[in-house]
Swiss-Prot record:
This is Glucanase inhibitor protein 3. One of its GO terms (biological process) is proteolysis. Residues 29-260 form the Peptidase S1 domain. Secreted effector that suppresses host plant glucan elicitor-mediated defense responses. Targets host endoglucanases and inhibits the endoglucanase-mediated release of elicitor-active glucan oligosaccharides from P.sojae cell walls. Residues 1-21 form the signal peptide. Belongs to the peptidase S1 family. Keywords: Disulfide bond, Glycoprotein, Secreted, Signal, Virulence. Disulfide bonds join 56-72, 183-195, 205-236. It is found in: Secreted. Gene3D superfamilies: Trypsin-like serine proteases. PROSITE patterns: TRYPSIN_DOM (PS50240). The keyword Disulfide bond applies.
Length: 261
């Protein structure tokens, strides 16, 4: 949910899905509302400059590490390259709040497949520790996720489709997680992805990727769990058509191996 970039705007043919639709990277917030200022401060925006527009999302998972999608770090010709992250900010750009930290390295998941978006995960290492608390990671066995559990996706993307403008303030929308079999049957994804959404008019959509999909446990932001990162979908806000997210639990072993180095 942020500014549309050439990386995020790329349209990719979806041969595995039996629908006539664009396989597009996400996201945008349809049918949601503003996140209260000063909350969900583990949410991260990727930027090319400290004050520039956010073009991809992520989540702080340790004081010095951000989890995002590998598609956000792809150094393709004409694409935006992240050099900075904005942590804890409510706004699309600027230095009004939060903190701006330099990225010193980016490591994509070893099994990342750019054609299918399997294992679409990347860990960014920061130059210095963030002052904000990181979000909790899910259990490796996937037990934090089950069919129809409510989740929340957040970001700065456009709030109307197809001609909307990016939101200057952090937005969120609540979506339900699909069961694995239903997700695979609908969109042909593997176990490194999960589906959420499918309620008409409420979705993440065309734009940047990497925005966090979280589960709230009713005990405040410190107890939120990172379930996924916004990836791709077919259409926007269509009934019975979910969006696809990178499943964080599928990469836990790899994530831990990177952040503990």
């Amino acid at each position: 949910m942020k500014v549309l970039s050439s990386l995020a705007a790329a349209l990719i043919a979806l041969s595995a899905v039996d629908v006539e639709a664009e396989h597009v990277q996400r996201s945008l917030i349809l049918g949601g509302g503003k996140v209260p200022v000063g909350s969900k401060t583990y949410t991260v925006g990727l930027r090319t400059t400290p004050e520039g527009d956010t073009f991809c999302g992520g989540a702080l998972i340790s004081p010095t590490h951000v989890l995002t999608t590998a598609s956000c770090t792809a150094y393709e010709e004409g694409s935006s390259i992240p050099h900075w992250v904005a942590v804890g900010t409510h706004y699309l750009n600027g230095k009004k709040d939060g903190e701006q930290l330099k990225i010193v390295s980016a490591q994509n998941h070893t099994l990342y497949d750019a054609s299918s978006f399997s294992y679409n995960l990347a860990v960014l290492t920061l130059e210095k520790p963030s002052k904000f608390a990181p979000i909790k990671l899910p259990k490796a066995d996937g037990s934090d996720i089950f069919p129809r559990v409510w989740s929340k996706v957040m970001g700065w993307g456009v709030t109307s489709y197809p001609n909307g403008k990016p939101s200057n303030e952090l937005q969120s929308v609540d979506v339900r997680v699909w069961g694995d079999n239903a997700c695979e049957n609908k969109l042909g994804v593997d176990k490194s992805s999960l589906c959420a959404g499918g309620e008409a008019g409420k979705d993440s959509c065309v734009g940047d990727t990497g925005d966090p999909l979280i589960k709230e446990n009713g005990r405040g932001d410190a107890d939120d769990i990172l379930l996924g990162l916004s990836g791709w979908g077919t259409g926007c806000g269509d009934k019975d058509m979910p969006s696809v997210y990178s499943r964080v639990s599928a990469g836990i072993e790899w994530i831990n191996s990177v952040i503990k180095k």
